[in-house]
């Protein structure tokens, strides 16, 4: 399993400009050829760029200082110093970049090859030949290069999916994701099996949807209990919420209400997103009666009953996903 990281704070530093050169042309038959000091090279800039197939910020470590290269000093014969190499930092799609000092959103990088120059390198200094005049024929000074800049930034990754699977621990979200997509979300019979979000692609006919399995939500998650708000943010950008409920449990309605309350407490926008209720584990003895009670209690909601174990209701659920997605 890869190390999922969706937030990291780093320091970025652009390169210093190279100093201009103080030099005078000295040749065999031209002992006083005049100033010929070249310009310094520009410092490297710091650029964030979206790269395909990146899904995490785990290759960055909190507190790291990442620097672009400095420009090289100018040389004689009016030769300019080499420019410093830019520092290109690759990020996944849907990465927000904040000024860590004041919390300002600097940029939102959403699509492949989007890029943002966050710091420009310092300009190279002018060599002494630039300062020659009719009065000052032999300037013995040059311009220093400009210093680069530094900035503390925070990177925040948002997973974007068409449908987010939301439920209490052990509701069956991971098993459902694995069944309808090619994802390999971890499955086991204990709470919080899913500790990081997993994405899968659901294909039907010539269309596809991105499905996200979000770690289980428990009562108080919106205040940081359990895995807390760490992953609730990832469903804030999904189009549709699929509330997965273990219909075999006696407290299935309480589970449903806990989910709604946590969504509402965390964000009204989440609460009012389009939803579909998935009553899972219909193969168990108590489920049929509970499912009828659920239909009666929540008759106005869109409800689909499924059994992943017996593969019942899966095709109907897939069709409903695509019907709902087309309403956007």
From Swiss-Prot:
GO terms for cellular component: cytoplasm
Domain OBG-type G, residue spans: 161-326
Primary localization class, coarse: cytoplasm
Hydrolase in keyword set: yes
Residue positions binding GTP: 167-174, 192-196, 213-216, 280-283, 307-309
Needed co-factor(s): Mg(2+)
An MF annotation (GO) of this entry: GTPase activity
Protein location: Cytoplasm
The EC number(s) this enzyme carries: 3.6.5.-
SUPFAM superfamilies, per the entry: Obg GTP-binding protein N-terminal domain (SSF82051), P-loop containing nucleoside triphosphate hydrolases (SSF52540)
GO biological process terms on file: ribosome biogenesis
Entry-linked HAMAP family: GTPase_Obg (MF_01454)
Family stated for the protein in its record: Belongs to the TRAFAC class OBG-HflX-like GTPase superfamily. OBG GTPase family.
UniProt subunit comment: Monomer.
Protein name: GTPase Obg
Lineage: Bacteria, Pseudomonadati, Spirochaetota, Spirochaetia, Spirochaetales
């Amino acid at each position: 399993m890869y190390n999922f990281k969706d937030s990291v704070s780093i320091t970025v530093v652009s390169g210093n400009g190279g100093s201009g050169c103080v030099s005078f042309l000295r040749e065999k038959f031209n002992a006083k050829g005049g100033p010929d000091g070249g310009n310094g090279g520009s410092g490297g800039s710091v650029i964030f760029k979206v790269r395909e197939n990146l899904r995490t910020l785990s290759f960055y470590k909190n507190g790291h200082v990442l620097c672009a290269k400095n420009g090289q000093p100018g040389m004689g014969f009016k030769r300019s110093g080499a420019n410093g190499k830019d520092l290109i930092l690759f990020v996944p799609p849907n990465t927000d970049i904040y000024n860590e000092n004041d919390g300002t959103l600097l940029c939102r990088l959403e699509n492949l090859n989007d890029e943002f120059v966050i710091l420009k390198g310092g300009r190279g200094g002018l060599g002494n030949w630039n300062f020659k005049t009719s009065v000052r024929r032999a300037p013995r000074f040059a311009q220093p290069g400009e210093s680069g800049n530094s900035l503390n930034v925070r990177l925040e990754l948002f997973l974007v999916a068409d449908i987010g699977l939301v439920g209490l621990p052990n509701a069956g979200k991971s098993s459902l994701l694995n069944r309808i997509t090619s994802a390999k979300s971890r499955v086991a019979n204990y709470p919080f099996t899913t500790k990081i979000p997993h994405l899968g692609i659901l294909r039907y006919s010539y269309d596809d949807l991105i499905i996200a399995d979000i770690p289980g939500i428990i009562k108080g998650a919106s205040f940081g209990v359990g895995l807390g708000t760490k992953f609730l943010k990832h469903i804030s950008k999904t189009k549709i919420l699929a509330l997965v409920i273990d219909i075999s449990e006696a407290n299935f309605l309480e589970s449903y209400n806990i989910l709604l309350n946590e969504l509402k407490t965390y964000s009204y926008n989440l609460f009012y997103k389009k939803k579909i209720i998935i009553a899972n584990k219909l193969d168990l003895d108590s489920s049929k009666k509970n499912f009828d009670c659920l239909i009666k209690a929540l008759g106005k909601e869109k409800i689909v009953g499924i059994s992943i174990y017996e593969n019942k209701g899966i095709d109907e659920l897939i069709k409903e996903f695509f019907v709902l997605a087309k309403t956007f």
